[in-house]
């Protein structure tokens, strides 16, 4: 009798599960059709480092070189990261530690490094002088922060003449020495002459954002910790910022994109959407930090809500920024435009988490997500629609 009861209970449970499965709607499958796709270089992997700002901005620069020169290059991220850390250390000590000193930074940081120090190919400075084949910076970040904090405390009451040399020595041990010269296609270059060879000019690029706490059509310093160089961005209404992005892709340009990615709609499966249902921000940086440790992270509830997205307003953008639900989490590289089977627009995004996910390292970010969660973008000034360039006084 007891055995019969167990079997009966099991049968009832199985029947209930079967009924529930029949009632649960199948998660939709997205079918993307590419509208416009501009050239990009290969997918890279920032791995265990907070250097998305460098990977994404250099990816953008590589696409610009492809567009203007036809050269397909792999530029050294760690050349840029090392130079950036040094500049930040100097400023941090000058300000007695009253500055953000961490792994994160901004697109403008990359442009300043290229302008001030030049650039080298990846093979000239891989930056893996610590026993791994991918970036792992937790130890380095902790060491450098501890070092600059100790220096800033001035235990000798006056700074020594050795502290910056000591900082440089730490960076060199992890990244290797900066090459003074190197050879590409049989020709010798310095970092500065190679920058001239590839034709990069930081004055050709425009930083754009959209917030209401500063006047539109004027530049302001975006108040985020990673903007430690205090670079300015031109402030446009949201619709005009989006117009710049669509125009850039249509005219053959790509876009450096800084965005919040803590939303539930930013998934492991290569999607970035804003479901109508209220979403909760996730804790965490980079792939594990933003979308979970494993592919087993449940996404069914997100997928089920995807077909209907929020209608984003300028006020919603501002509220997210003011309440810190929209922050400068992650830098990526937008290079194309696609539509799903319902005709919804998606920007095609090159990420820096390696060849991973459903689309092999590419994400599809919906118009709604980009409107809501963009912190800033960088584009070539010629990508601006003429009427917007005129409003900004850009020629």
Language model regions located:
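Active-site signature of cysteine proteases
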Residues: 165-395
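Bacterial Sec-dependent N-terminal signal peptides
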Residues: 1-23
């Amino acid at each position: 009798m007891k055995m019969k009861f167990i079997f009966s209970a099991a049968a009832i449970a199985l029947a209930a599960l079967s009924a529930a499965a029949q009632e649960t709607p199948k998660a939709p499958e997205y079918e993307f059709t590419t509208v416009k796709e501009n050239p990009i270089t290969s997918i890279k992997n920032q791995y265990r480092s907070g250097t998305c700002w460098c990977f994404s901005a250099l990816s953008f620069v590589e696409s610009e070189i492809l567009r203007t020169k036809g050269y397909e290059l792999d530029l050294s991220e760690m050349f840029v990261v090392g130079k950036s850390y040094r500049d930040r250390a100097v400023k941090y000590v000058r300000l007695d530690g009253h500055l953000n000193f961490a792994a994160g930074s901004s697109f403008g940081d990359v442009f300043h490094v290229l302008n001030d120090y030049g650039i080298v190919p990846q093979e000239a400075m891989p930056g893996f002088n610590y026993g791994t084949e991918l970036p792992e910076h937790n130890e380095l970040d902790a060491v450098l922060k501890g070092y600059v904090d100790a220096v800033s405390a001035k235990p000798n009451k006056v700074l020594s003449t050795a502290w910056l040399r000591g900082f440089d020595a730490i960076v060199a041990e992890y990244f290797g020495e900066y090459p003074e010269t190197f050879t590409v296609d049989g020709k010798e270059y310095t970092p500065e002459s190679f920058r001239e060879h590839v034709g990069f000019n930081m004055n050709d690029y425009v930083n754009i954002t959209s917030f209401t706490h500063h006047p539109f059509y004027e530049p302001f310093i975006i108040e985020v910790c990673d903007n430690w160089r205090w670079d300015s961005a031109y402030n446009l209404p949201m619709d005009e910022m989006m117009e710049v992005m669509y125009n850039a892709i249509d005219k053959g340009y790509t876009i450096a994109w800084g965005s919040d990615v803590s939303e539930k709609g930013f998934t492991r499966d290569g999607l970035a959407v804003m479901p109508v249902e209220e979403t909760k921000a996730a804790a965490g940086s980079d792939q594990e930090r933003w979308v979970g440790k494993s592919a087993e992270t449940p996404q069914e509830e997100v997928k089920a809500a995807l077909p209907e997205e929020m209608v984003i307003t300028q006020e919603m953008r501002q509220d997210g920024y003011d309440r810190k639900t929209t922050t400068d989490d992650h830098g990526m590289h937008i290079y194309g435009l696609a539509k799903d089977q319902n005709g919804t627009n998606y920007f095609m995004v090159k990420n820096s988490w390696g060849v991973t996910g459903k689309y092999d390292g590419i994400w599809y970010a919906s118009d709604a997500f980009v409107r809501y969660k963009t912190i800033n973008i960088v584009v070539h000034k010629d990508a601006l629609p003429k009427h917007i360039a005129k409003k900004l006084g850009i020629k």
